[in-house]
């Protein structure tokens, strides 16, 4: 399961992962959390509120929003929609190349 944590109006908002053996839990947070968080070097602030989709070719993508102002340091609800690839690394951990602030190819 992915989830958003912290206050969406601030830079500490981000996306985390939790796993469980059953839909009702118990849930365990991923050791490598957060999956995405603010990265001002990439021009990204406060990624969150996400969905994961699988394309016809089997690739996973994460669709999320982030602050439109990449240097957000105050409450802001001006958001843009983003999409980035998700993949499992050689150890079976869910990873992404995101968050990004650049256009991505249409899946």
Model-predicted regions and their roles:
Residues 1-107:
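Carbohydrate-active catalytic/glycan-binding domains of CAZyme proteins
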């Amino acid at each position: 399961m992915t989830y958003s944590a912290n206050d969406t109006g601030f830079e500490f908002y981000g996306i985390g992962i939790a796993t469980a053996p059953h839909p009702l839990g118990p849930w365990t947070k991923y050791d490598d959390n957060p999956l995405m968080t603010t990265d001002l070097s990439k021009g990204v602030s406060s990624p969150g509120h996400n969905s994961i989709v699988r394309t016809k070719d089997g690739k996973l993508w994460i669709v999320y929003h982030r602050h439109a102002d990449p240097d957000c340091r105050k409450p802001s609800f001006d958001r843009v929609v983003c999409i980035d690839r998700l993949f499992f690394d050689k150890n079976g951990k869910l990873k992404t190349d995101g968050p990004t602030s650049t256009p991505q190819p249409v899946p």
